[in-house]
Structure formats: structure tokens, C-alpha cells
Curated annotation (Swiss-Prot):
It comes from the Bacteria. Gene3D superfamilies: Glycoside hydrolase, family 3, N-terminal domain. Pathway: Cell wall biogenesis; peptidoglycan recycling. NCBIfam families: PRK05337.1. GO terms for cellular component: cytoplasm. It comes from Vibrio furnissii. This is Beta-hexosaminidase. The record marks 171 as: Important for catalytic activity.
Amino acid sequence: MGPLWLDVEGCELTAEDREILAHPTVGGVILFARNYHDNQQLLALNTAIRQAAKRPILIGVDQEGGRVQRFRDGFSKIPAAQLYARSDNGTQLAEDGGWLMAAELIAHDIDLSFAPVLDKGFDCRAIGNRAFGDDVQTVLTYSSAYMRGMKSVGMATTGKHFPGHGAVIADSHLETPYDERDSIADDMTIFRAQIEAGILDAMMPAHVIYPHYDAQPASGSPYWLKQVLRQELGFQGIVFSDDLSMEGAAIMGGPAERAQQSLDAGCDMVLMCNKRESAVAVLDQLPISVVPQAQSLLKQQQFTYRELKATERWKQAYQALQRLIDAHS
């Protein structure tokens, strides 16, 4: 597997998609709502992606729940993370949410959902109800349960957005936010605890600048990724960049410069989404390399959607989560 994640055009592969997927620098494909029409089509698309790559490749999606759920019709509704803490049995429901989300993706030959959000607080426009809580203990309690659910069915976990995106109001999809606080120790407590618990397989840093600490966005900062994440916190898993086509990454230069800076800073894999010319520029200019440890993120189970929906576990989780959503809609 190479270090670059990119997207494909639609519900079926184009000739250009196939050519690009065969490039050795490509290590992953991230899917969007436009890639989904129905369950059978999605399964066929993922089979075609793996065949075109001619080698192991990761397939991922943002399917964390609430407003960030790319596949809707034909999939169970997953609650927004904020809802779990509002229920008496929220810990079990959070575990059900992680399990159900992961199981349904695995049944469609998808390896990863980039989840969960470990950011604290609801004020940031980009985060909002994607956060599990606005205090450290609430985030730890419910994110841990959600990740237990994911891992129990064979999906790796990705914590985001290190070292904490929740306190900035600006949206890093649209601009580069600055977190002007003197200390982000509270936010860091969450990431530290989940690393020490050994429950995180991958990490996604924020396109946020913390000027009190460093002048670069965390996603392109050796200080945050090498010194803090790797050395001080001892994180051993895969580090993804967030989408480098987002405006929050523009401060790092053009597409190839962004990718190279992120890799040099300590990212293992980089995402370049929804701008094909940018992805091609990275393929053309990035030296060919492999990320052997990324194979550990491939899904650990295999079953069909029909088999999954026939289980009592699926029926119980589906009904419990639907009741939670209905109670707060």
C-alpha cells in the first residue's frame, strides 16, 4: 500500500479511476454519498476497486453517525455522538452504535469509518453534535464504548482530530482555524487516555494552528506528530492527514507540497479528496513509497449484509438506536 488516499468519480469506476488505482502510491479510497446508489451497487464498486488496485487497498468512508453519514438509504441510521450521553443506558447504546456502523460497512466490503470524533465541546461549527460531550469524562466514557463496538466486529478505530478541534469556532473545511488558548491540556487528556488504553488504531490530526505551541497546522507539524504524538504520548498506530484539499491545509502550499509536508511531519498516509487534478499532481510528484503497517487496518471479518441482518445482535442494536433517535427528533 502506498501513502495516498483519493476518491473515485461515481457509482462505477471510470477508465481513469482504474488507471489511477493501479498506481503504486495509492493506498486507500475514500467513498462519498455520490458513490452510493444501493447496497448491491456499493458491493460491486468495492469489488471493482480491489480488482483495479491488484494489491491490498483500504476502502474507507465517513460514517460516524448523525449528519456525517454518507450512506443512508439501505443502511441503519446511526445517532449523532452527542445523543448517547442523554440516555440512561447511553454506554450500551454507544457500543451498539459503533458495532452497527462498523458491521454494516464490513458487510459491504469497507474496511474503515474514520471514527470516532474525540474532540470536546459542541461550539465548533465543524464539530457540533459530532462530539460525545463537552467535558473530558463524558467524551472518554462514550467514545470508549463506541470504539469497543467497532473493534468487536473487526473494524479499526481512528481518533480525530488530534490534538483537539472542539474549541475553535472556524470550520477547517473553509479556512485555517487558530486555537489561541495558552493550554489545550484538557483536550489532550482525552487523546492521551485513549492511547494509553490501547484502543486507538489510527489518528487523524486537525487542520488547526495552535500558535502558543507551533506555527504549523497540526496535520503538517513535526512538533505535534513526532514530538507530542509519537514521543511524548507513545502512539504506535497509523497517522492519517485529514483531507488535504480542505482550505485549512492551503497554508502548506500546492497539492504535492501539502502531501510531502504532511508525510515529512509524521503522517503515514495522506488524503486528497474531490479534486482529481490535485490527486494526480501528488501521484506525479510524490516519490513512490509503501506503508506496510497500513495492512493492519484491513477489516478483520467477512460476512454478507443478509447474514448480518438475520442476527439477533443486529436486530437489537437497530431497534435500540432507532428508539434513541426517535426520542430526540
